[in-house]
Amino acid sequence: MNTMIKILLIALAGLCACIAAQSAEPRAFGWKPDVGGVVDKAFGPRFRGATIKESVDLRAKMPPVYDQGAIGSCVSQGVGVALDYAHVKSNPGLKFFTPSRLFIYFQGRVAIGTVNQDSGCQIRDAIAATQKLGAPLESLWPYRESKFKAKPPTAAYSDALKRQIIQAYKAETLDDVKRALSLDLPVVFGVPVYRSIMDLSWFNYTLPMPAKNERSVGGHAMVVVGYRNSDSMLIVRNSWSSNWGRSGHMLMPFEYWNKFQRQTDAWVISVAE
């Protein structure tokens, strides 16, 4: 066996081991469907004049992909990265700061009285809390899964006020999502997901449509960071680390979005201090 074949076999073995380890990692969800509230500014009427581009890809402009681990903090991961992105976009010259996702997750559960449970939360509650309280630096309340029940320290609350969401809008249609992305604004959304989402990899990172009579395994919040009209795909960022999917991302068919549009809960954070 020549040297090149040996190298290829070793690389293939390493890839298989990586895929096996990836599939064995715990996966958590945590999105609670929207039940209505006071944070309701519709995106469509305010930005109807925005031109929808043929394609958009914001991946290179976003902070590194987060990892929620084994707790249901997906909403705080999505709102956190959207806040970080909007903060930098609204303040040219600043760098990404990485908000405390554990802080956002705690405040999102305060609204529903479940701070002692790993209950997940609604996107609107996490946004409303971040409008009121802001989000501190990750270093002031680090992401330690075992600490999800603990109230953040006073210093975290003081620092959080430096970074607040100023404007957030509800995106109600796929065209709303495309218009937001055409304005370089990512979209945080929650949707029912199925077992197949846990099996995506570098080589297979397109989310399949659920089979007939297949049951959802939960609700999950993610972030749309692009789309392609050419093959009717959304580019979606997850919070299961960069080892999942293709560097932490997947492709979601427009068909999937349209199928669940009435259940999908989507938000655009356009301005942050």
Region locations from a protein language model:
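General secretory precursor processing signal
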Residues: 19-21, 77
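Post-signal peptide N-terminal segment of mature Sec-exported envelope proteins
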Residues: 31-37
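Active-site-surrounding "flap" and adjacent substrate/cofactor-binding loops of secreted or lumenal enzymes
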Residues: 82-113
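Predominantly the structural core of cysteine protease catalytic domains
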Residues: 23-29, 41-45, 49-54, 80-84, ...
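Bacterial N-terminal signal peptides
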Residues: 7-17
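Active-site alpha-helical elements of protease catalytic centers
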Residues: 70-86
